[in-house]
Amino acid sequence: MAVPTGRALVFVTGNAKKLEEVVQILGDKFPYKLISKKIDLPEYQGEPDDISIQKCKEAARQVDGPVLVEDTCLCFRALEGLPGPYIKWFLDKLKPEGLYKMLAGFEDKSAWALCTFAFCAGKEEPVQLFRGITEGHIVEPRGPRDFGWDPCFQPEGYDKTYAELPKEVKNSISHRYRALAALSEHFCQDNGAPETKRSKHQD
């Protein structure tokens, strides 16, 4: 099932700031009109790719059309990748300060942020995955507290946290930017027919 250029693509999120950031990163060249929709999806468990695929399939079933689903992981090297895909619950309970304190007993404060966008053209269609990773460190929270764990993640090569960086700077280096760049390049090259060139990451 091809998705014609200009057709609406449902981005599954209830987070206005996330939608704003995604639209800003994608820019005018992205061939679809992005529409946000909050959908109640099961809280899947497992490896990041498996979670993304399951969520995207369920969203496509509910929407009965093309959907885009995002999953974000924050992975601490000292904890062998945890919290990983469960960062949402850790953040809800601990806040950025608590995430920082989790590594108090470890010398290694390094971490990586992983963003996975899953696209599905419709029910029964394969899921394509686009990933982005940004390396960094977990630091004592600094900056505005209005966007998740941004205050405690300092990207490699910068002396400011995600929260302290100007939006245009963050949006040019973030894990979300890298994943969206891969997605946008894939769709723009395919000129509105994402199914004609399969990603190797499909189910």
Curated annotation (Swiss-Prot):
Binding site for ITP: 13-18, 55, 71-72, 88, 147-150, 170, 175-176
One annotated Gene Ontology cellular component of this protein: cytoplasm
Binding site for Mg(2+): E43
EC top class, as a word: hydrolase
Entries under InterPro entries matching the protein: ITPase (IPR027502), ITPase-like_fam (IPR029001), RdgB/HAM1 (IPR002637)
Pfam families tied to this protein: Ham1p_like (PF01725)
Co-factor: note: Binds 1 divalent metal cation per subunit; can use either Mg(2+) or Mn(2+).
Subcellular compartments: Cytoplasm
Cofactor(s) for this UniProt protein: Mg(2+); Mn(2+)
Broad class of the protein's primary localization: cytoplasm
Reaction catalysed by this enzyme: ITP + H2O = IMP + diphosphate + H(+); dITP + H2O = dIMP + diphosphate + H(+); XTP + H2O = XMP + diphosphate + H(+); N(6)-hydroxy-dATP + H2O = N(6)-hydroxy-dAMP + diphosphate + H(+)
SUPFAM superfamilies xrefs: ITPase-like (SSF52972)
Described purpose of this protein according to its UniProt entry: Pyrophosphatase that hydrolyzes the non-canonical purine nucleotides inosine triphosphate (ITP), deoxyinosine triphosphate (dITP) as well as 2'-deoxy-N-6-hydroxylaminopurine triphosphate (dHAPTP) and xanthosine 5'-triphosphate (XTP) to their respective monophosphate derivatives. The enzyme does not distinguish between the deoxy- and ribose forms. Probably excludes non-canonical purines from RNA and DNA precursor pools, thus preventing their incorporation into RNA and DNA and avoiding chromosomal lesions.
Family membership noted in the UniProt record: Belongs to the HAM1 NTPase family.
Subunit (UniProt): Homodimer.
Protein name: Inosine triphosphate pyrophosphatase
Gene source species: Danio rerio
Gene: itpa
